[in-house]
Amino acid sequence: MMTLKVAIGPQNAFVLRQGIRREYVLVIVALCGIADGALIAAGVGGFAALIHAHPNMTLVARFGGAAFLIGYALLAARNAWRPSGLVPSESGPAALIGVVQMCLVVTFLNPHVYLDTVVLIGALANEESDLRWFFGAGAWAASVVWFAVLGFSAGRLQPFFATPAAWRILDALVAVTMIGVAVVVLVTSPSVPTANVALII
């Protein structure tokens, strides 16, 4: 399950950025951990089976996720092309409410996250229904560890991001990566284990 979290996505890119800036890292890590816990619980509890039983919902998640990723890529590309207040020492800390709102956006308004965190983890957990909640707990623990490591270790990179040019490079890389992930989402049919997947609350 750690491979799902390590994959580059809008949420990880956002946590990385906040970690480098050393702004509200604990709040963001905690928020991402709680959100993932809720999504994993939904999948393990049976929501994954509900989505899997309705192919149209999966289709919406695929194309909606790709659209979200492309939109995020365009925002990153804009920041890379026309940087504004990228260096923490120059721009000052962002408002907490704005940071929290952005964290919620990249977490819950990205349809692709529901394919990974809800559908895939939920389906895998229900392969062994008696142990599904232990599986979910393990997946959640891995998620929390990943966000903590990413957020708190990213601060060590701050010296490398002391100039706007470094942030422009990061945003450019994020933009290219998001486009690549969007293409993969569009051309790859989601493969979800189906055996023993049932609505078990």
Swiss-Prot record:
GO cellular component: plasma membrane
UniProt xrefs under InterPro entries: LeuE-type (IPR001123), Lys/arg_exporter (IPR004777)
Chief location: membrane
Keywords: Amino-acid transport, Cell membrane, Membrane, Transmembrane, Transmembrane helix, Transport
Protein name: Putative amino-acid transporter Rv0488
TM segment ranges: 25-45, 57-77, 104-124, 133-153, 169-189
Family in the record: Belongs to the LysE/ArgO transporter (TC 2.A.75) family.
Lineage: Bacteria, Bacillati, Actinomycetota, Actinomycetes, Mycobacteriales
Membrane topology: Multi-pass membrane protein
GO biological process assignments: amino acid transport
Cited Pfam families: LysE
Subcellular location: Cell membrane
One annotated GO molecular function: amino acid transmembrane transporter activity
